[in-house]
């Protein structure tokens, strides 16, 4: 679930998604119960939707077409 705070400063284009991904990984059962690192849990498939959203956000910053025309699929 996305978390947005009004008193937090802007950190960049994908800072919110990155923070949500980190929080999701740290709160997952993989990290809390099994004691694995967040990187290992990410490779196993935890928080896959947020990982894909973060990837799409980073890719849209590099893609000149989506920068000028907007994201595809709208």
From Swiss-Prot:
Coiled coil: none annotated. Keywords: Disulfide bond, Phosphoprotein. GO terms for biological process: leukocyte differentiation; multicellular organism growth; spleen development; thymus development. The modification Phosphoserine is found at residue 37. The keyword Cytoplasm does not apply. A motif (Cx9C motif) lies at residues 47-57. Residues 27-65 form the CHCH domain. The keyword Phosphoprotein applies. Involved in an early step of the mitochondrial complex IV assembly process. Belongs to the PET191 family. This is Cytochrome c oxidase assembly factor 5.
């Amino acid at each position: 679930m996305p978390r947005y705070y009004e008193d937090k400063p802007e950190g960049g284009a994908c800072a919110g998604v990155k923070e949500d991904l980190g929080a999701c990984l740290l709160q997952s059962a993989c990290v809390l119960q099994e004691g694995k690192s967040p990187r290992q849990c990410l490779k196993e498939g935890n928080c896959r939707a947020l990982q894909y959203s973060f990837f799409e956000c980073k890719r849209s910053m590099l893609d000149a077409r989506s920068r000028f025309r907007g994201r595809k699929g709208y």
